[in-house]
Regions:
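Conserved N-terminal alpha-helix of the aminotransferase class I/II PLP-enzyme fold
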Residues: 3-51, 73-80
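Short amphipathic alpha-helical segments
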Residues: 12, 176, 227, 231, ...
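Short glycine-enriched loop/turn motifs at secondary-structure junctions
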Residues: 34-35, 82, 173-174, 284-286, ...
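PLP-dependent enzyme catalytic core of the Aspartate aminotransferase-like
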Residues: 38, 79-80, 87-89, 101, ...
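Conserved PLP-enzyme active-site core in the AAT-like
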Residues: 40-259, 265
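Generic non-transmembrane alpha-helical segments
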Residues: 131, 251, 255-259, 302, ...
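Conserved C-terminal alpha-helix-loop-beta "cap" of PLP-dependent enzymes
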Residues: 257, 263-349, 353
Length: 375
């Protein structure tokens, strides 16, 4: 029977929506092409995509080397991994040599973000990929903040790319979703990755087939077809939106940088310690997230509450400008040490810049910053 061949991985087809689905596949194929990858698996959220990408190839006793400044949710996920006997080590700095220092014979994954959130640190993907590959280890990169519009990590050496497609890919905050994309080129050593050994006969599809027929299927972290449909709609305007997002963010960052009493962090500013790497990797913009410190937690709250255009929301990537106080929201449960490593401070405000008229945004921030200047 043809259906049996599908279940036995001897024929292509759809077996069950928890594993695959035509609408979801259409979304996966689009992302695969945008990321210049080989194959993708869409998940219920960005966190599910990160978990599946790593858990597919690690087991108890293995180690993960991760970049500093990771998104708080990812840090908390990695704490959960440690409860399964998987050790996560964080580099002190995202320089390639810092990754090299932490890699041991137990390391099975190197993990990084193209742009950290909210630290906004930028990883040199090619340099870190070279370090990982020298040890026979895949590099997994979270491309959520950049999107494939700004950078395609696979072309720089990344082996797996994850996106929280709830953000810029969707663009309207109407669907929680995530997706991982494999390059189809990384050669997994059967001794180092014994869980993949039975699947190596599938060649470049080994990583994906193992995932679909194991962890992904059995944990139920699949994307709903409706959310895949909404993401497909979002993809149709991704390029236009990202162009406006990035130009607005660059202009707003430069404008905010003229105010005394605040410190602006944005990779597009020459004052950013990551500007040189960002300039090398990004050709169409520096992303659409800005953070700035205002001197005190009290002033940060006053500014956030007084702004008229932005919504106070913990999400990023919406067409609308969004502001949040990370220390009391998305990073609330992190330790003080982890907050500092993630670039989170009590007086920090994060802005996900939308596609509104830039002059309107400037005027809104000007009025609020000036009114709170002496408070």
């Amino acid at each position: 029977m043809y259906k049996r061949q599908i279940f036995d991985n001897k024929a292509m087809g759809f077996s069950y929506t928890r594993i695959n689905n035509p609408t979801i596949e259409a979304f996966e194929k689009r992302i695969t092409k945008l990321e210049e990858g080989f194959s993708s698996v869409a998940c219920s959220s960005g966190m599910a995509a990160i978990f599946n990408s790593i858990a597919n190839i690690v087991r108890q006793g293995d180690e993960v080397v991760a970049s500093c400044g990771l998104y708080g949710g990812t840090v908390e996920l990695f704490e959960d991994l440690e409860s399964f006997g998987i050790t996560v080590k964080y580099v002190a700095d995202n320089k390639p040599e810092c990754f090299e220092e932490l890699i041991t014979d137990k390391t099975r994954v190197v993990f990084a973000e193209t742009i950290g959130n909210p630290k906004l640190d930028v990883t040199d993907i090619k340099a870190v990929a070279d370090v990982a590959h020298a040890h026979g280890i895949p590099l997994i990169v979270d491309n959520t903040v950049s999107t494939p519009y700004l950078i395609q990590p696979i072309t720089l050496g990344a082996d797996v790319v994850v996106n929280s497609s709830s953000k810029y890919i969707n663009g309207s905050s109407d669907a929680i979703s995530g997706i991982l994309t494999f390059n189809g080129k990384f050669k997994f050593d059967k001794e180092k990755y014994p869980g993949l050994k039975p699947y190596l006969k599938f060649g470049p599809m080994a990583y994906i087939i193992k995932l679909r027929n194991g962890l992904f299927r059995n944990t139920g972290g699949c994307l709903s077809p409706q959310n895949a449909f909404l993401n497909n709609l979002g993809l149709e305007t991704l390029g236009l939106r990202m162009e406006r997002h990035c130009s607005n963010a660059y202009e707003l960052a430069r404008y905010l940088d003229t105010f005394e009493g605040i410190t602006v962090n944005y990779p597009g500013l020459e004052s950013s310690p990551y500007h040189e790497v960002a300039d090398k990797q990004f050709t169409k913009g520096y992303g659409a997230i800005i953070t700035f410190r205002v001197g005190s937690k009290e002033r940060a709250f006053k500014i956030i509450n007084a702004l008229k255009i932005p919504n106070i929301v913990s999400n990023i990537g919406d067409t609308k400008t969004l502001v949040i106080h990370p220390a009391s929201t998305i990073a609330l449960h992190l330790s003080d040490k982890d907050k500092e490593a993630s670039g989170v401070y009590d007086d920090l405000i994060r802005v996900s810049v939308g596609i509104e008229d830039i002059d309107d945004l400037k005027e809104d921030f000007r009025a609020v910053l000036e009114s709170t200047d002496n408070e």
